């Protein structure tokens, strides 16, 4: 991945599939499906024999010095290791921050570190420096215009290729607040229906146990587009969730 830039998740996955695995990645956003998908692709590419060695580095659970020690330890056997560090802003000590930044500037090639920053509003000096040094991959839920291609991609992974636009629209309608929720709905439908069964919008509604939630930016977009009915729908949803 080129440094100091934003990379879209689809391009990042293609690069990993092509065998280009960087020693450090930064994932920015909170769509669990995209997070899991990218990590799975890295696992497959980084450990081709299937023997995955992955460790979670959580600042709230580990001593800061232990996190640095694990990253910088020299393995005499040069075995590959994958580390996933969530919420790097949890690293507080000045010395620890400096050592962490030094590592991501000069990482060990037999290790792969995936840093997850789920909050776009995190403006801490450490997070800014991390993004400036490594760049980042956007794993926020895509805008609605791009959701359709992801829905079809998920169905293809389930071996379902004959999916109508009406089915795609139904899924986005009920679960389009995140790819994670869409993936759950697709899993349910594909598990219940036989492989040769034609999936219909009625199937989506029948098996769905999810009611879509909306974000504030979607309300502002609907208002800007002068879409009254959608503005009212999203506004009611936001108010209902705020009052509960």
Q: Can you annotate each of these PLM segments?
A:
Residues 1-244:
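Conserved beta/loop motifs at nucleotide-recognition and modification sites
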């Amino acid at each position: 991945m080129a440094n100091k830039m934003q990379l879209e998740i689809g391009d990042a996955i293609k690069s990993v599939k092509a065998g280009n695995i960087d020693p450090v990645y930064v994932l920015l956003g909170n769509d669990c499906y995209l997070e899991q998908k990218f990590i799975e692709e890295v696992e497959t590419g980084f450990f081709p024999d299937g023997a995955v060695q992955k460790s979670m580095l959580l600042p709230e659970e580990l001593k800061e010095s232990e996190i640095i020690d694990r990253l910088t330890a020299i393995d005499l056997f040069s075995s590959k290791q994958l580390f996933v560090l969530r919420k790097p802003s949890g690293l507080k000590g000045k010395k620890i921050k400096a050592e962490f930044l030094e590592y991501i500037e000069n990482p060990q090639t037999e290790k792969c570190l995936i840093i997850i920053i789920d909050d776009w509003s995190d403006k801490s000096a450490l997070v800014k420096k991390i993004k400036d040094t490594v760049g980042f991959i956007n794993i926020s839920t895509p805008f609605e215009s791009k959701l359709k291609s992801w829905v079809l991609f998920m169905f293809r992974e389930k071996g379902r290729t004959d999916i109508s636009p009406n089915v795609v629209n139904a899924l986005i309608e009920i679960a389009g607040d995140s790819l994670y929720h869409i993936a759950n709905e697709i899993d349910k439908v594909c598990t219940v229906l036989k492989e040769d069964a034609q999936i219909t919008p009625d199937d989506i509604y029948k098996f769905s146990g999810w009611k879509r939630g909306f974000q504030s930016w979607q309300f502002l977009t609907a208002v800007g587009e002068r879409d009254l009915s959608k503005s009212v729908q999203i506004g009611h949803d936001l108010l209902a969730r705020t009052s509960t």
